[in-house]
Regions:
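Non-catalytic helical/linker scaffolds that mediate oligomerization, partner binding
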Residues: 1-318
C-alpha cells in the first residue's frame, strides 16, 4: 500500500515532511498546473533531503484552468462575470466552443456560472453558485468537447527535466483515449525518461468509456473524483468509482483514489465519519494507493491528515 501527499506551502518544510513520512507517507505529488518544475528547486531539494522515495508530477495536459488573478474574486449569485479577454483569463478554446446556456464549473465545482453570451473574445456569464475564486483554479464545461492538446508546451519542458529531478511517475490529467497515453510515452522517451511510470487520471466521461482501451498502456490509473464529479451528477460518482475500480482490479492494474479524501481536515484536526468510511471503502475495493491533495498542500493539519489516511487504509487491509 502506498500513501501520497501533495506538496504545498502547508507542508514544504523538512520537519513537516519528515513527520508525514514517519506517519507512513511513501510518496509526494507536485502539481505543475501552478508553476513549472524549474521553479520548484527548493521543494525538490527538501523532498530529496527528507528521502521521500516516490515523486509524482501532475501535468497540465488537456485540463482547463483559469489564469492568474491580481487578487481573489468574491462572486455572488446573480453577479456578472466575464471569462476571457478583459476579464478572468481562460483558455481561448473554451471561449470559442461555449454557447449561451452552457454551465461552467470552477474550482472542482465549488462555483457555478452559466454562459449568457459570447463576443468572440470572451464569455459573459452569470454566477449561479458563488464563492471565492482564486488563481489557476480548475474550469470544467460539462458535456462540451473543447479541443486541446494532450501535452502543453509547459508539459514538454517539464518532462525534459523530470529524469534529472528524480521524478518516478507522471500523472496525465483528463485522459481521453489511448493516443493520449502514447503521446506521453513518446515524450518521455524523447526526454530520455522512458523509465518513468505513467499514471492515467480518469476525470471525464471520455476517460471512463475509453478505460478498457488504454488500460494495457498505463502503469497505474488514478480515479480523480474532483473533475470526474463535475462530469456527472454527484450521486452517480460512487457507482462510477466502484465500476472503475472493478475494471482495474480485473485487469490487474494498480489504481489510486484521490480528491477530498479528508477535505474537512483542511480546517479541522479530526475527520468526519464519512471521510474515514470513504477511505476504508476505497481500499476494500482494491485501491493500492490513496492520496491527499489540498489537505497537505494548503490545509492546517497536514501531518494529522496523513496519519488518519494511513491508519484508516491499514485497518481496511487487516
Amino acid at each position: 500500500m502506498e500513501f501520497y501527499g501533495t506538496i504545498g506551502p502547508a507542508c514544504a518544510q523538512p520537519e513537516t515532511l519528515q513527520r508525514m513520512v514517519e506517519a507512513g507517507m511513501t510518496g509526494i505529488r507536485m502539481n505543475l498546473s501552478h508553476g513549472p518544475l524549474s521553479a520548484h528547486k527548493d521543494w525538490l531539494d527538501i523532498i530529496h533531503a527528507v528521502g521521500i522515495p516516490q515523486l509524482l508530477i501532475d501535468l497540465q495536459g488537456p485540463e482547463l484552468r483559469i489564469g492568474t488573478l491580481p487578487q481573489p474574486l468574491v462572486l455572488e449569485p446573480g453577479q456578472s462575470l466575464r471569462l476571457g479577454q478583459g476579464g478572468v483569463p481562460c483558455p481561448a478554446a473554451l471561449v470559442h466552443a461555449a454557447r449561451p446556456g452552457q454551465n461552467l464549473l470552477l474550482d472542482d465545482g465549488r462555483l457555478l456560472v452559466q454562459v449568457a453570451g459570447a463576443d468572440g473574445a470572451a464569455l459573459q456569464c452569470t454566477v449561479v453558485r458563488g464563492g471565492t475564486l482564486q488563481s489557476r483554479k480548475s474550469l470544467a464545461a460539462p458535456g462540451l468537447a473543447v479541443a486541446s492538446p494532450t501535452l502543453t508546451e509547459a508539459d514538454l519542458q517539464n518532462l525534459q527535466l523530470a529524469g534529472a529531478c528524480g521524478v518516478t511517475g507522471v500523472m496525465l490529467p483528463f485522459v481521453r483515449g489511448a493516443e493520449d497515453i502514447r503521446a506521453l510515452r513518446r515524450a518521455l522517451e524523447q526526454a530520455g525518461a522512458g523509465q518513468i511510470r505513467i499514471f492515467a487520471k480518469i476525470e471525464n466521461l471520455a476517460g471512463v468509456q475509453a478505460l478498457p482501451e488504454f488500460l494495457p498502456l498505463v502503469d497505474e490509473v488514478v480515479i480523480a473524483r474532483g473533475d470526474l464529479g463535475n462530469a456527472m451528477p454527484l450521486w452517480e460518482l460512487p457507482r462510477c468509482q466502484k465500476q472503475l475500480s472493478a475494471v482495474c482490479r480485473s485487469a490487474g492494474v494498480p489504481f489510486m483514489v484521490v480528491t477530498q479524501m479528508l477535505d474537512s481536515m483542511c480546517s479541522r484536526a479530526v475527520p468526519t465519519r464519512a471521510e474515514v468510511s470513504d477511505i476504508y471503502n476505497a481500499v476494500s475495493d482494491g485501491a493500492s494507493r490513496v492520496m491527499l491533495t489540498g489537505e497537505t498542500a494548503a490545509g492546517q493539519y497536514p501531518v494529522e491528515a496523513m496519519e488518519y489516511l494511513v491508519r484508516t487504509a491499514r485497518t481496511a487491509l487487516e
